[in-house]
Structures are given as structure tokens and as C-alpha cells.
């Protein structure tokens, strides 16, 4: 009898998302600490909101991974080894507020693409609960991109 609940490629992609979400949270925290400028009071708490959003997504993805017989990455070493996002040291005087926000937009676009990949893989493997979860998370990331790009004077799909 075939195992209808074996989703190896979905598990692999969920683990990719675990690594990427963990790194993105670190990058957002870096922005939170080092941002300066006239929009500081508005953007500084927004970074907390983004990290709260990503922490919720990360927890749900890791728990879904366990539910489908996977083992989420759980060490800093694993996150750094597997993430597709940069691990860059910056200081407050290296980047402008717009630079930080552009970097954040680019990283959210990367995450959006990883969610899309996960949605497609889950569809192929017929893991529809995972697909539903990722659709909701991608929708939230799409909104983040739209709003950040509007701040930058761009459209949501401007590259």
C-alpha cells in the first residue's frame, strides 16, 4: 500500500523556509537596531511587527514539518548553512533608511518566491494543508512587499 502521507520535497522546502525565516528575522532585527532618520519612529516599531509575523510563520512551518514526519533545522549553524539570504554585517552609518528598506524589500521578494516554490511542490505532492498554510503566508508577504515598495516610491512588482 502506498504511503499517501509522504511528502519528501515538501519537507525539504519547509526546512528551506525554516532557515530563511530565521535569517530574515535576524536581518530585520539588524535593521531595527541600526536604522536612523526622519521615519525612525514609524519604521522602528514596524520591524517588531514584521518579526512577530515571521516568528508566527516560522513556528507554524516548523510544527507542520514535524506533523509530516520532518525535522526542522534548529541551530544557528543549520540556518546559516541552508539559507539563501545574506548574512551581512552592517553598522548604523553604512546604510540609509531607504537602503535598509530596499534590502528588506529584496529579502521579502526572495521569501515570496520561496513560498511560491513551496506552494507548487505541495501541490505536486498533494499536501494540501501545507499548500493552504503557505498560500496564507505568501499573501501576507505580498502585502509587506507592496507596502515597503510604496514607501520607496515603487510598485509591488518593480524590480
Placement of each model-derived feature along the sequence:
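Disorder-to-helix initiation segments
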Residues: 1-17, 97, 104
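Conserved alpha-helical segments that form or flank metal/cofactor-binding pockets of metalloenzymes
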Residues: 42-79
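A structural signal for well-ordered alpha-helices, especially hydrophobic packing surfaces
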Residues: 18, 25-28, 32, 51, ...
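Amphipathic, non-transmembrane alpha-helical scaffold segments
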Residues: 14, 44-51, 55, 101, ...
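Long, contiguous binding/interaction regions
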Residues: 2, 35, 40, 52, ...
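Acidic/histidine-rich alpha-helical segments that form the ligand environment
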Residues: 59, 83-136
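Helix-loop segments that flank and shape redox-cofactor active sites
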Residues: 2-9, 24-49, 114-129
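Short conserved catalytic/interaction loops centered on acidic-Pro-aromatic/His motifs
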Residues: 127-131, 150, 156
Amino acid at each position: 500500500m502506498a504511503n499517501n502521507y509522504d511528502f519528501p520535497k515538501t519537507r525539504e522546502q519547509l526546512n528551506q523556509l525554516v532557515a530563511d525565516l530565521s535569517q530574515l528575522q535576524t536581518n530585520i532585527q539588524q535593521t531595527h537596531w541600526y536604522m536612523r532618520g526622519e521615519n525612525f519612529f514609524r519604521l522602528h516599531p514596524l520591524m517588531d511587527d514584521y518579526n512577530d509575523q515571521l516568528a508566527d510563520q516560522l513556528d507554524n512551518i516548523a510544527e507542520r514539518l514535524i506533523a509530516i514526519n520532518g525535522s526542522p533545522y534548529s541551530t544557528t549553524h543549520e540556518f546559516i548553512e541552508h539559507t539563501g539570504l545574506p548574512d551581512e554585517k552592517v553598522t548604523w552609518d553604512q546604510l540609509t533608511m531607504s537602503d535598509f528598506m530596499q534590502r528588506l524589500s529584496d529579502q521579502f521578494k526572495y521569501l515570496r518566491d520561496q513560498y511560491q516554490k513551496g506552494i507548487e511542490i505541495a501541490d505536486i505532492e498533494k499536501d494540501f494543508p501545507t499548500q493552504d498554510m503557505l498560500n496564507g503566508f505568501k499573501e501576507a508577504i505580498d502585502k509587506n512587499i507592496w507596502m515597503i515598495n510604496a514607501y520607496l516610491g515603487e510598485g509591488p512588482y518593480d524590480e
